[in-house]
């Protein structure tokens, strides 16, 4: 026999995977702990390689690495193949009889010894370990029970060629669970003259080693092998009804042990990520009881065809009374199994122990759950949201525990997917990423639907802006305008009006600033103009004219807001800036001609006479007339200018004020200094104006709101109704999109897991595990060009993608056919592997 390459001294053992190291050590009967890490396995492999190269003795190595004597003889090694990449199935923790007395445990141990003696054969390799012996002392009894509970059973991978036969055998046992009791009853009632140990079961079992499925213990696997063998030779067992029976195994103790070990064990952890590709149908039945009748109906045809082709199996059925009709002997009403002798019509109920009562109660729950289903459920998609699939904690599970999908939504998603975990559905429903796959429903343009929804949302938001934001902006604009207008008077520390900052051209602005600043420096403070005889003062210190009132903003006036402009007496008509300037010049002329000597004392006015001064100013004005008409056409400024002229006219310091008013026209240096000083004080003046008049403005706004509260109430009601409708539309659209996205992403993930698993069975270099990060990237980052659904998921908003992935993880973790935990990797880099049953028409 050719020595494999990994036994070469130059071969690096660290390149082997953990599962390969385990298989190699198991093949050469080198014991290793079930919790052994890769470093420990490499050490044992190095010793094995030295033994293969003749450096040490293989016998001594095997003797030094044998299982501890306290382990159960049920820990066995099946027929080992040369396939080093064979998958080791998950370990199952065995739950023994709770609170058993010494007599029952002793009988159980004797029963195990008898069964193990029947299974000795050259084709079934059993580790040489001592049987469990439990003394009658209570202390020793308690220690033995603790050791039995702490065991973990190692079961090797079964060859894939025996999948069909074993599926039929296991499902046959599942369809007629009470047939196991019929077998035992028939065996125990046979003639006691023949010794049980003389019967050779190995000749009937052959090389087939039934893998222990998720809920089958060693003794149950033995019963399956016995039913598959189908030997027509009568089996002679001891008659337990005789009081002098040589074999202490009796009917009551056997049913007690069998009932306890037939209970489903809801295990949730596994020490190995690899498991047998053949799964018992008990997995899907236990997780979804509604599948019980459908699975029985579908597999009954395959069982009948197998019985017709195998005569020995049929003869064994005739011998022990095993038939498909025996399932009718169990009824939930009487809570007992009735065994009918093949040659007699009378039936007698079997005695029940505490363990068998629990088993019967569990079956009652399955029947009740099946009877309570009022609508058909797709048996091809099994989830266990009612049970915890795993007690391991992962980051994504912690993050999304509060957002798990409900059972109804999961059932709707599962019915659309058509996934297969029982090996009955079509392969087209399992492999979804193929070009010739025909969708069950017409293609739905997810992108266009989302675009339509968001476009409609934008229109509604625009209406919302018009109904609410525009009136709010109107309030703000009106308040700002009121602050500016009222700030023209009543601000004692204001050197010049803040609105002059926007006045153009600069020469005219600087002239007025200079005059106002000079007056302030001389102690002349701005004050409100007294109300004329034909006007009345408003509550916000603005002047209301009795005649000719016009609103500045028609839109706000319709809502009750009427910010009237500042009025002047009717005797003064000011319509244009030019008329204002003409009136200004006439006043200047009067002042100049009235006291020319005093005015001429100023250095800048020495060479000026009255006429030349006025003409010079007019020339300067008409140079900027067009700009003034276009920019400075505000009524507020006109009122302010007229008020300023009146104040200057009544001032005793008229001549000095006029000098500072017109000096920038001749001295530009002084103009620059004045403007800089005025601009530096502008922020302070604005704040003072706001603080001074905020109270009066708020009172005015409050009265305006009270006068038109019905209109704003109507706007609020319309806005609430519109917002509610938009919110409901968005919720419905998001729910539909999330459901569709979960269906597409789950189908892609399952198909990729199945393809990778199938490829790894033929190509040992392919890792059957697919990282979760890669699956998420396929759905939401890269997408698949052939799949339109995945291509649309890439363009969804990030929040919707996150919600879809949360539900995808919940669905995949709930499936019994997906391995969620990888103990050799960190939680953030975990991987999934398909360990379910493939359809019969999938070619390996």
Curated annotation (Swiss-Prot):
Per its record, how is this protein called by name?
A: Meiotically up-regulated gene 61 protein
Q: What does this protein do?
A: Required for correct meiotic chromosome segregation.
Compartments in which it is found: Endoplasmic reticulum membrane; Nucleus membrane
Its ancestry begins with: Eukaryota, Fungi, Dikarya, Ascomycota, Taphrinomycotina
A GO BP annotation: attachment of telomeric heterochromatin to nuclear envelope
The ranges of region (Disordered) come to 333-354, 384-415
Superkingdom is Eukaryota
Enumerate the CDD domains for this protein: LEM_like
Keyword ATP-binding annotated: yes
Q: How does it assemble?
A: Interacts with sad1.
Molecular function as annotated in GO? ATP binding; chromatin binding; heterochromatin-nuclear membrane anchor activity
Basic and acidic residues composition bias: residue spans: 395-407
- Keywords, comma-separated and alphabetical: ATP-binding, Chromosome partition, Endoplasmic reticulum, Meiosis, Membrane, Nucleotide-binding, Nucleus, Transmembrane, Transmembrane helix
Q: How does it sit in the membrane?
A: Multi-pass membrane protein
């Amino acid at each position: 026999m050719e020595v494999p390459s990994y036994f070469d001294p130059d071969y690096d053992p660290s390149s082997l995977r953990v599962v390969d190291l385990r298989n190699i050590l198991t093949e050469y009967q080198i014991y290793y702990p079930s919790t052994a890490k890769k470093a420990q396995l490499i050490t044992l492999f190095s010793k094995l390689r030295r033994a293969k190269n003749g450096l040490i003795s293989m016998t001594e190595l095997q003797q030094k690495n044998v299982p501890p004597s306290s382990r159960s003889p049920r820990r066995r090694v099946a027929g080992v193949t040369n396939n080093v990449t064979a998958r080791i199935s998950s370990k199952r923790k065995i739950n023994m009889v709770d609170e058993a007395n010494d007599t029952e445990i002793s009988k159980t141990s004797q029963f195990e010894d008898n069964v193990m003696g029947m299974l000795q054969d050259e084709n079934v390799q059993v580790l040489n370990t001592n049987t469990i012996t439990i003394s009658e002392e209570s202390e020793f009894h308690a220690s033995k029970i603790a050791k039995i509970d702490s065991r973990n059973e190692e079961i090797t991978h079964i060859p894939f060629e025996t999948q069909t036969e074993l599926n039929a055998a296991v499902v046959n046992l599942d369809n007629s669970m009470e047939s196991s009791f019929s077998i035992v009853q028939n065996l125990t009632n046979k003639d006691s003259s023949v010794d049980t140990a003389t019967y050779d079961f190995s000749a009937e079992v052959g090389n087939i080693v039934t893998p222990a499925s998720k809920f089958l213990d060693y003794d149950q696997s033995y019963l399956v092998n016995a039913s598959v063998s189908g030997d027509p030779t009568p089996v002679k067992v001891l008659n337990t009804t005789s009081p002098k029976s040589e074999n202490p195994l009796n009917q009551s103790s056997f049913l007690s042990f069998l009932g306890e070990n037939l209970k489903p064990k809801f295990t949730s952890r596994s020490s190995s990520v690899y498991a047998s590709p053949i799964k018992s149908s008990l997995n899907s039945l236990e997780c979804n009881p509604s599948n019980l009748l459908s699975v029985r109906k579908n597999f009954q045809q395959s069982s009948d065809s197998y019985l017709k082709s195998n005569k020995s199996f049929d003869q064994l059925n005739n011998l022990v009374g095993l038939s498909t009709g025996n399932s009718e002997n169990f009824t939930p009403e009487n809570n007992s199994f009735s065994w009918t002798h093949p040659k007699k019509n009378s039936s007698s109920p079997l005695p029940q122990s505490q363990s068998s009562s629990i088993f019967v109660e569990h079956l009652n729950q399955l029947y009740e759950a099946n009877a309570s289903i009022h609508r058909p459920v797709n048996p091809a998609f099994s989830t266990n949201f009612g049970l915890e699939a795993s007690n391991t904690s992962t980051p994504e599970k912690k993050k999304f525990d509060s957002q798990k999908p409900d059972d109804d939504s999961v059932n709707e998603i599962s019915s659309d997917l058509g996934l297969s975990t029982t090996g009955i559905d079509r392969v087209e429903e399992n492999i979804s990423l193929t070009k010739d796959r025909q969708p069950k429903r017409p293609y739905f343009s997810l992108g266009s639907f989302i675009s339509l929804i968001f476009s409609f949302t934008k229109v509604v938001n625009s209406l919302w802006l018009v109904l609410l934001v525009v009136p709010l902006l109107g309030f703000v604009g009106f308040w700002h305008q009121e602050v500016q207008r009222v700030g023209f008077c009543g601000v004692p520390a204001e050197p010049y009006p803040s609105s002059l900052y926007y006045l153009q051209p600069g020469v005219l602005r600087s002239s007025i600033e200079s005059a106002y600043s000079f007056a302030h420096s001389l102690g002349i403070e701005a004050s409100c103009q007294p109300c004329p005889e034909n006007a009345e003062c408003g509550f916000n210190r603005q002047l209301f004219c009795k005649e000719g009132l016009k609103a500045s903003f028609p839109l706000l006036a319709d809502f009750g807001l009427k910010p009237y402009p500042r009025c002047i007496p009717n005797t003064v008509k000011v319509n244009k800036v030019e008329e204002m300037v003409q009136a200004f010049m006439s006043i200047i002329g009067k002042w100049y001609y009235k006291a020319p000597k005093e005015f001429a004392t100023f250095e800048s006015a020495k060479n000026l006479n009255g006429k030349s001064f006025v003409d010079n100013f007019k020339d300067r004005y008409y140079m900027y007339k067009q700009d003034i008409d276009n920019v400075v056409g505000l009524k507020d400024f006109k009122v302010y200018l007229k008020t300023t002229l009146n104040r200057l006219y009544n001032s005793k310091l008229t001549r000095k004020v006029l000098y500072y008013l017109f000096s920038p026209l001749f001295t530009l240096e002084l103009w620059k200094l004045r403007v800089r000083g005025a601009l530096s004080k502008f922020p302070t003046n604005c704040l003072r104006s706001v603080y001074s008049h905020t109270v009066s403005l708020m009172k005015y706004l409050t009265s305006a709101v009270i006068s038109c509260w019905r209109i704003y109430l109507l706007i609020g009601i319309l806005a609430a109704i519109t917002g509610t409708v938009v919110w409901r539309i968005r919720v419905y659209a998001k729910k539909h999109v999330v459901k569709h996205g979960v269906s597409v992403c789950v189908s892609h993930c399952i198909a990729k897991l199945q393809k990778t698993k199938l490829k790894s069975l033929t190509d040992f270099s392919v890792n059957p595990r697919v990282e979760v990060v890669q699956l998420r990237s396929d759905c939401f980052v890269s997408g698949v060009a052939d799949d339109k659904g995945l291509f649309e998921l890439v363009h969804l908003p990030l929040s919707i993608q996150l919600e879809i992935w949360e539900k995808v993880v919940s669905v995949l973790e709930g499936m019994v056919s997906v391995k969620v935990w990888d103990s050799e990797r960190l939680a953030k880099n975990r991987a999934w592997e398909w360990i379910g049953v493939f359809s019969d028409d999938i070619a390996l």
